[in-house]
Amino acid sequence: MEIKYLLTVFLVLLIVSDHCQAFLFSLIPHAISGLISAFKGRRKRDLDGQIDRFRNFRKRDAELEELLSKLPIY
């Protein structure tokens, strides 16, 4: 019975430590690189590219809807 509790506590600690490691080694470097790119002005260019991709996506989506509306329904 005690082994089950010990195993459960070990797994919980393993999961928590994995999340903490992911937080420290993933979020902090991304935040630093985001600040650096914001100071250099790259963020605005990235947003412009995202807007263009979104417009292209909406255009392709409309074309797909038009194509599907022309197909016969079985």
UniProtKB/Swiss-Prot annotation:
Q: Which residues cross the membrane?
A: none
Q: Which residues form the propeptide?
A: 46-74
Task: Give the domain of life.
Answer: Eukaryota
Instruction: Tell me, in one coarse class, where this protein mainly resides.
Output: secreted
Keywords (alphabetical) are: Amidation, Antibiotic, Antimicrobial, Cleavage on pair of basic residues, Fungicide, Membrane, Secreted, Signal, Target cell membrane, Target membrane
Q: Name one GO biological process term.
A: killing of cells of another organism
Q: Which residues carry this modification: Lysine amide?
A: K40
Q: In which tissues is it expressed?
A: Expressed by the venom gland.
Instruction: Please state the span of the N-terminal signal peptide per the UniProt entry.
Output: 1-22
Show the GO cellular component annotation of the record: extracellular region; membrane; other organism cell membrane
| Location in or out of the cell | Secreted; Target cell membrane
Q: Which family does it belong to?
A: Belongs to the non-disulfide-bridged peptide (NDBP) superfamily. Short antimicrobial peptide (group 4) family.
Q: What does this protein do?
A: Has antimicrobial activity against the Gram-positive bacteria S.aureus (MIC=8 uM) and the yeast C.albicans (MIC=16 uM). Causes hemolysis on horse erythrocytes (64 uM for 100% hemolysis). Minimum bactericidal concentrations have also been tested against S.aureus and is four-fold higher (MBC=32 uM).
Q: Please identify the protein, giving its name as recorded.
A: Antimicrobial peptide AcrAP1
